[in-house]
Design a protein with these regions (language model features):
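Short gly/ser-rich loop at a beta-strand->alpha-helix junction or flexible surface loop bordering the NTP-binding
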Residues: 1-189
Length: 189
């Protein structure tokens, strides 16, 4: 059981939840024992980390993705940052999730929705929206046209966004969002 938990936690940058622990067959009393012996560290309510797990640059993202569960994905400005698209310098960690518990911290910006498998990719311990989904999310959000232009131009330049795929997507977008995407595409050609 310990090996199964270690495998699961390592896939999540060392993080795991109370729910995961109990599903693997640990007793509630085991949690206290592992905290007392120092092998587990309590991070937040119902969120723990293996003490000896190596640190990562993706740790803050992994922590919150683990806390919200398998349906959570890094999105919007945070996804753009991780993809290297634009210079948005987000003040919050943006997550898309179907869960609706209140945010446990003010450092999160939650976007409540479900994402299809074609809209996310696995990057190390994280689920993250694809560059295309990220650009579309940003076009629908409140970022400036100049910043959106930069995100789209960077994505096209490094081959992570297809201008033709974004153009095709415009037909199914609300009018104002489609116009913003079209302007961004025009700015990068």
């Amino acid at each position: 059981v310990v090996e199964e938990l270690t495998r699961a936690a390592m896939a999540q940058a060392g993080y795991f939840t109370t729910t995961q622990v109990l599903r693997l067959g640990f007793a509630a009393s085991d949690i206290g024992e592992h905290l007392a012996d120092g092998s587990w560290v309590k991070i937040e309510r119902d969120l723990f980390r293996l003490r000896d797990c190596p640190r990562s640059d993706l740790e803050e993202f992994a922590k919150w993705c683990t806390w919200f569960g398998a349906a959570a994905a890094v999105s919007h400005q945070s996804a753009a940052e991780l993809h290297g698209l634009g210079h948005l310098y987000p003040r919050f960690i943006h997550l898309s999730t179907v869960l609706s518990p209140p945010s446990p911290t003010q450092q999160l910006a939650l976007h409540r929705r479900s994402l299809g498998p074609e809209e996310v990719e696995q990057v190390g311990p994280l689920r993250i929206t694809t560059p295309k989904r990220t650009a579309l999310d940003l076009a629908a959000s409140g970022i400036s046209q100049e910043l959106l232009d930069e995100v789209v131009a960077d994505g096209v330049a490094i081959g992570r966004l297809s201008a033709s795929a974004l153009q095709r997507e415009c037909g199914s977008l609300p009018g104002q969002v489609a116009q913003r995407v079209e302007r961004a595409l025009a700015a990068c050609t």
